Amino acid sequence: MKFVIVGRGILGSSLYHMLRKLGHDVVVVESGERRVFPSLIHSLLLKDKDIELARMSLDFYREFSVPMREFVSITLGKIGKDILNSWERAGVEIGETYVDWLKSNGIVARGGDRLVYVSKLISSVPFVRGKAKVDLLQEKVYLDGKELHADRYLVVAGPWNPCLLKVKSKSYYCWATLVASRMRELGNHFVYDYEKGFYSRPLLGLGTGIAIVGDGRVIESPPGRRIPVQEDEVLDRARERLGPLVPLYTAGEFCEGTPDMRPAYGPITDRVLYAGGLDGYGAEVGPGLAKLLVDFIVSGEKVQEYFLDRFSHVTNFTIGREPHEI
């Protein structure tokens, strides 16, 4: 079978490798407009079925030798016992203890968090550069005005999906700030602070006090616009916990959010299928969602919790906060 994949992000790259492994002919098209960050968070410290997607993603990264680096994480705030038990069932070693450098009790987790070097995954995928257009009535895809012939078209273009398919999702802008701190521990730990409302992740993991801080806040906007942000809104809260922080650089990118801020997949027509709504945690759930789409194509298997038709009665919605991590 021949597939055309529209979008070479985490989803498109994962689908490419999965379908090629099954022996299919696959062409990936990409406009090249999106920024590809070198590394992103992969965490198992999620909730409910998202943990299963994250486990599937982790298996994919290992199978296809995507580089990763594991870190200890510290979660601050009250976390329900049912969630803690689900983390342990996923293979994470957790324990509550006093963390001197944070001056607070926290849940210390080992085996749950890592940086995954998604740029290596994405750069491994050959692609044809150009702007795609989808004609749903004719079930055709055009690249710069020229029809692309395939048996199935998989549209996984992230924040451009609402424009291409009119799916019930929205484009939004999310951002985080690179900071310098006197706390060297920030450079080799993840911190999820649900009391102050921020997260922190290492930049490189060298223990130099250089980290990336954000809070999952979003601004709804079509992709490609220049969006001004107030970085001190999150940094002031982070300083209450971490002390002095010097902002070095703030960067962001456009993402795609669904009405419930969880991933979605399913058919738009018989030949045009969709996956998306990664909601800022695509490195965690992206390859897992790609696997669900492949399973649906091959066998018709559906996981209703993530299936696109759950939004069939949604008429209007507002994007929520990104799930970092629960």
Explain the meaning of each model-derived region.
Residues H17-M18, I41, P67-R69, R152, ...:
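Active-site substrate-recognition segment that forms the wall
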